[in-house]
């Protein structure tokens, strides 16, 4: 039977519940247990798909096409379990399902209330998402005390009672601030946070105390005394220079032993040698490159969380320190491509909307004409096609219909019909809702032998995840290929352009899919590794 570890946060937000949860999951997985993770988001949006990147950060896309919280990206990077639609849900999704059932008459005329109807739906989704895992870690978004999270906290209170103490435990993350003028850490915020939890019937079993300074034994003993938590279950988690150290930090304090003993699980010891290798390669690079990342959402780098991590993973795989130079594409528009001088490669990620697009197009032109390694992702591929159409083919008004409906040369247009991974035909129009209407999730892609992208993957057919509603216009493709543009990747049915490469260029690859969603610190990703290798080769030319 599945055991549940519910994870909450207190005092302040952004303590790193997702990282701490994923790190514990990684240790339990290293002990031979089958582990999964869930993220419960208290906001009323049905999913984060239409939320601003400046507010929410990245939308992580699962293999089965769910638009989810960025924490699911952390989960997949730390454990081998692939996340799905069942691993993330919101208040909006819960209410939507309950109201749909009410309209069908499923509740037989009952008055619909938060308790029991909303809490029952939350519990049902938790149990479904956990599946047949040995241990399911369930992270509750937000901070204890927020009004939005109350139904979720009540649901896990009920579920703990229903499954019993031997199958459920609560891990609470808190902040233990260091007061420089006093020269000591303060435990009072943690005490009050636990008091808030206990007032709603939740007693934490584990406290993970975040701080920028070590928390000494006396402070941990004091926290244990005032919170009714075992002293060995008060874990000190101070800031580290790489998040991939955290599994080792938690293991060294015996957190996994405490969990295994509490649940009565029979399993081996934790083999964290893979994580030791990751940390060693991350902290002891032998080479160094500088790569410009030109995007639209540079004010909040969480909008590119998986991509930034994927570049770090590529550095780990190549024993290379990857310095990312973050450049806003609007700055390229206003200040010119001089901002790109001196870099070893250029990366243009995805995005939506007209703002900053011309800066991205200028960036592509600079990379293509100066023979600088280029990787374009999603919109980064679309602007590569637009740039080629304008400056090589000669269609000066070439554009995407997303940005200019009146263009006489719409080389990128709305996908009106495509076949999903299950073989079903999906159809969209300009009048379709924005939410949940994109080409989403894992799709097959056929690669052309002898191409740069084929050299990276070393296979003819790959599977990558998508999140887009615009594609290369096949009606204008013949003129583009006649002018030299190489189409080196197509969708499984051959209908859609997935990868393009520029001719007479050392390394210019642009893909419609999002390879960053499947990159992990232990395995890296072949496309990003190839990109970093190209950057190293470019740097060697300068010497």
From Swiss-Prot:
GO MF terms held by the record: ATP binding; CTP synthase activity; glutaminase activity; identical protein binding; metal ion binding
Catalytic activity: UTP + L-glutamine + ATP + H2O = CTP + L-glutamate + ADP + phosphate + 2 H(+); L-glutamine + H2O = L-glutamate + NH4(+); UTP + NH4(+) + ATP = CTP + ADP + phosphate + 2 H(+)
The family this protein is said to belong to: Belongs to the CTP synthase family.
Residues given in the record as ATP binding sites: 14-19, 71
EC number: 6.3.4.2
Gene Ontology biological process terms, A to Z: 'de novo' CTP biosynthetic process; pyrimidine nucleobase biosynthetic process
InterPro entries assigned to the protein according to its UniProt record, in alphabetical order: Class_I_gatase-like, CTP_synthase, CTP_synthase_N, GATASE, GATase1_CTP_Synthase, P-loop_NTPase
Active-site residues, as the UniProt record annotates them: 378, 514, 516
Protein name: CTP synthase
Gene: pyrG
Gene3D superfamilies (UniProt xref): 3.40.50.880, P-loop containing nucleotide triphosphate hydrolases
Native organism taxonomy: Bacteria, Pseudomonadati, Pseudomonadota, Gammaproteobacteria, Pseudomonadales
């Amino acid at each position: 039977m599945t055991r549940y570890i519910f994870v909450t946060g207190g005092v302040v937000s952004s303590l790193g519940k997702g990282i701490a949860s994923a790190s514990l999951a990684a240790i339990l997985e290293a002990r031979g247990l089958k582990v999964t993770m869930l993220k419960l988001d208290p906001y009323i949006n049905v999913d984060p798909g239409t939320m601003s990147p400046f507010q929410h950060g990245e939308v992580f896309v699962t293999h089965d096409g769910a638009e989810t919280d960025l924490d699911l990206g952390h989960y997949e990077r730390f454990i081998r379990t692939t996340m799905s639609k069942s691993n993330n849900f919101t208040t909006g999704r819960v209410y939507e399902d309950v109201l749909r059932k009410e309209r069908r008459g499923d509740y037989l005329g009952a008055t619909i209330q938060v308790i029991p109807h909303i809490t029952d739906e939350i519990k049902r989704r938790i149990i479904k998402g956990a599946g047949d895992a040995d241990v399911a870690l369930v992270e509750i978004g937000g901070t204890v005390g927020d009004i939005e999270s109350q139904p979720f906290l009540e649901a896990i209170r009920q579920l703990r009672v229903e499954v019993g103490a031997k199958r459920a435990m609560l891990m609470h993350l808190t902040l233990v601030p260091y007061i420089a003028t006093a020269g000591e850490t303060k435990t009072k915020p943690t005490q009050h946070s636990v008091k808030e939890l206990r007032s709603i019937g939740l007693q934490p079993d584990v406290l993970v105390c975040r701080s920028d300074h070590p928390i000494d034994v006396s402070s941990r003993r004091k926290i244990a005394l005032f919170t009714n938590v075992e002293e060995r279950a008060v874990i000190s988690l101070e800031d580290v220079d790489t998040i991939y150290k955290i599994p080792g930090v938690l293991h060294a304090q015996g957190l996994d032993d405490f969990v295994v003993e509490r649940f009565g699980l029979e399993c081996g010891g934790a083999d964290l040698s893979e994580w030791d290798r990751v940390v060693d390669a991350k902290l002891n690079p032998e080479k160094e490159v500088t790569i410009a990342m030109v995007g639209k959402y540079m004010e909040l780098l969480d909008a590119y969380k998986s991509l930034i991590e994927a570049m770090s993973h590529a550095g780990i795989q190549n024993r290379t320190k990857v310095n990312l130079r973050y450049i806003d594409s609007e700055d390229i528009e206003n200040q010119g491509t001089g901002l790109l001088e001196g870099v070893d490669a250029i990366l243009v990620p995805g995005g939506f909307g007209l703002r900053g697009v011309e800066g991205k197009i200028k960036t592509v032109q600079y990379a293509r004409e100066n023979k600088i390694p280029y990787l374009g992702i999603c919109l980064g591929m679309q602007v590569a096609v637009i740039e080629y159409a304008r400056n090589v083919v000669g269609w000066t008004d070439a554009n995407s219909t997303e940005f200019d409906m009146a263009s006489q040369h719409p080389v990128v247009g709305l996908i009106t019909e495509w076949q999903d991974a299950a073989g079903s035909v999906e159809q969209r129009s300009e009048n379709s809702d924005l939410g949940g209407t994109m080409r989403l999730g894992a799709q097959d892609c056929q690669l052309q032998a002898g191409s740069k992208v084929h050299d990276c993957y070393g296979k003819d057919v790959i599977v990558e995840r998508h999140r887009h509603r615009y594609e290369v216009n096949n009606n204008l493709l013949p003129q583009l290929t006649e002018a030299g543009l190489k189409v080196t990747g197509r969708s499984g049915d051959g209908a859609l352009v997935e990868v393009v490469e520029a001719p007479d260029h050392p390394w210019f690859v642009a893909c419609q899919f999002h390879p960053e969603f499947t990159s992990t610190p232990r395995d890296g990703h072949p496309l990003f590794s190839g990109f970093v290798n190209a950057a190293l080769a470019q740097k060697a030319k300068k010497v």
